[in-house]
Amino acid sequence: MEIMTAKEFLKQYEEADRKARQHKAEYERELEMIGSLSVKMDGMPHGSNISKPTEEAALKLADRALKWKEAEENALRIRQEVYDTICNISGIEGRVLYERYINLHKWEEICILVHYSWNGIHHVHRRALQLVEEMMVLNGTHIR
């Protein structure tokens, strides 16, 4: 098992979500490119054969779709692990962790949501990270 801090553990979902969105964007970009490859706009009739470039692009698109699906499944699995951990933290500490690491809000947004100052929210966050680290130690999860 990988050794990580509480913060690294919690931030895993943000990275996995970013990767899934990146795969989705690439899939959509390639889908758009296939459309432009397969349409000839010269007004002349053409056969129904699929060109080699279009066929290759379609195969790449299928591969991209699989990578996107795998990335989304990974993000959902990690999200659930992080969510389950955060659910064990009560009070404002749990709320701050939820907004930061599940809803992926920025600190400014969290300050507004929970009516805390910038310094106050970071103080709560430090306490929350300590609680997560204590929980990781109790559960036998490796931390540094």
Question: What are these model-derived regions, one by one?
Answer:
Residues 78-81, 89-93, 124:
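N-terminal positioning helix adjacent to the helix-turn-helix/winged-helix DNA-binding module
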Residues 121-135:
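DNA major-groove recognition helices of helix-turn-helix
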Residues 116-119, 131, 142-143:
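Juxtamembrane/interface motifs at transmembrane-helix termini
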